[in-house]
């Protein structure tokens, strides 16, 4: 009984810290050459742009059209994933959710790239037993969703994207049906609190990425061509439980 009580107290404490969010509208930036400082910046719990990472050679349009493994991913009933990507453009909205995005990532090679480059820079020895990365591949515009993982890394593969971010404290100003929407497309017909809806646009080019802390709102769009984007969700047991319990995933 005492053990259960102690575990219960620990769970409550961890949940409390998970729910704490910094709502400052500022971002940090760092060059990949300074990656030894990544962990210290992540402790600030504000968005962090990482520049000039080693390029990702997977999940580009060329990669999807050339590797046969993508043709067999069961995303659509009537057409293949390859056909959809080949006909999509910068205005196409990504039609799949996290479960399908994870299936695509599993064959893309994202985990190999992340294990070689990203994980060693941010997952310390003691965090290996606590953080569990989950990988997702997206194609097309992705509307608003709320970050749940302790950290979510967003990175474009082969073209520039614009990521819109909003802190948790703007939630009361959002439309009732904010999910999958885009901040720059909301009007006074969607919400009477449009002037309170503050967001920041961050331009990411291939080789750059954005770490987003939990409890922020994010969306992204491409320019000129369909955006091919990868995300890596660094989950703690608490955030993973919240992810599976969320009605938005």
Predicted regions mapped to residue ranges:
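N-terminal accessory scaffold of Fe(II)-dependent oxygenases
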Residues: 1-209, 217-249
